[in-house]
């Protein structure tokens, strides 16, 4: 989850991702978040990069990856997002994902 506050410290909203947020990068009023493992529900559809409008928490984009996304970066103009995926082993021994560099255009 990501908790967002105003500059005066008052709580604004909470954004709840479907998996663990591994890293967050910012460009203006948007945030790109790397979403990785979900050890509670094993929801592998949660893996990927999510782009959020920081003004209201609206999800602008979601870019799915097969494996957990470990790192993310967003360009200064907010138009491009890069992410690093890594493989993971599921509880039943299946390997999902691979070591990959992803570049997405918004």
Name every feature range the model reports, one short phrase each:
Residues 6-10, 53-57, 106:
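Short loop/turn segments that connect beta-strands within beta-propeller blades
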Residues 10-15, 58-63:
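A short beta-strand motif characteristic of beta-propeller blades
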Residues 19-26, 67-74:
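Repeated scaffold domains used in trafficking and secretory/extracellular systems
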Residues 31-33, 81:
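Hydrophobic beta-strand positions that form the internal "hydrophobic ladder"
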Residues 37-39, 85-87:
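Residue-level signature of beta-propeller blades and closely related beta-rich strand-turn architectures
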Residues 40-47, 91-98:
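Short, solvent-exposed loop/turn segments at conserved positions within beta-propeller repeat blades
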């Amino acid at each position: 989850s990501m908790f967002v506050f105003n500059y005066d410290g008052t709580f604004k909203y909470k954004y709840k991702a479907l998996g663990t947020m591994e890293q967050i990068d910012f460009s203006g009023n948007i945030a790109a978040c790397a979403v990785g493992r979900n050890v509670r529900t094993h929801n592998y559809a949660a893996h990927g990069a999510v782009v959020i409008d920081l003004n209201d928490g609206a999800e602008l984009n979601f870019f799915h990856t097969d494996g957990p996304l470990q790192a993310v970066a967003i360009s200064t103009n907010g138009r491009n997002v890069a992410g690093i995926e890594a493989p993971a082993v599921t509880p039943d021994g299946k390997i999902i994902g691979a070591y990959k560099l992803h570049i997405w255009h918004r």
